[in-house]
Amino acid sequence: MISSRSIAVSAVFGFGLGFTSVAWADTASDACGALASARTALYSMINAKDVSAQDALNAKVREASTKLDSVLAGMTGADAKAAADFKALWEQFKATRDNQIIPAIYKGNAAEAKKIADGIQSERLSKMWSIMSCK
């Protein structure tokens, strides 16, 4: 005979598993959204012609990056492996962006910035997208 206690334990356990997948989906979705925002703002920055527009877009890049860093820091348990794999690429992505792409933009060399963004950065973006199962 099934006791009400085993039903309650099963219900709580089942709810916990359901909550975990929802939490992963929300966290991954937040990471994907922040990554897309950072990439979109950077691409807009490459195409912007005046410094004030570039500065405003750079602020958006930084804001999205900060949000993504925060989401990654909050990923624990089963999500920690994906976060670690993602973060390794994300750190490379940020370094290239901050040390090569953004300086090229501010020097007026949009073609060089775009070349880097469409090259190695695009490869990294694709890998990060895959790790988080972004859609």
Where are the regions a protein language model picked out?
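Sec/Tat signal peptide C-region and signal peptidase I cleavage site
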Residues: 18-25
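Membrane-proximal N-terminal soluble sensing/regulatory segments of transmembrane proteins
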Residues: 26-84, 104-118
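Extended, amphipathic, non-transmembrane alpha-helical segments
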Residues: 92-96
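Transmembrane alpha-helical segments of integral membrane proteins
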Residues: 100-101
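Bacterial N-terminal signal peptides that target proteins for export
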Residues: 1-11
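Extracytoplasmic
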Residues: 116-135
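Bacterial N-terminal signal peptides
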Residues: 10-18
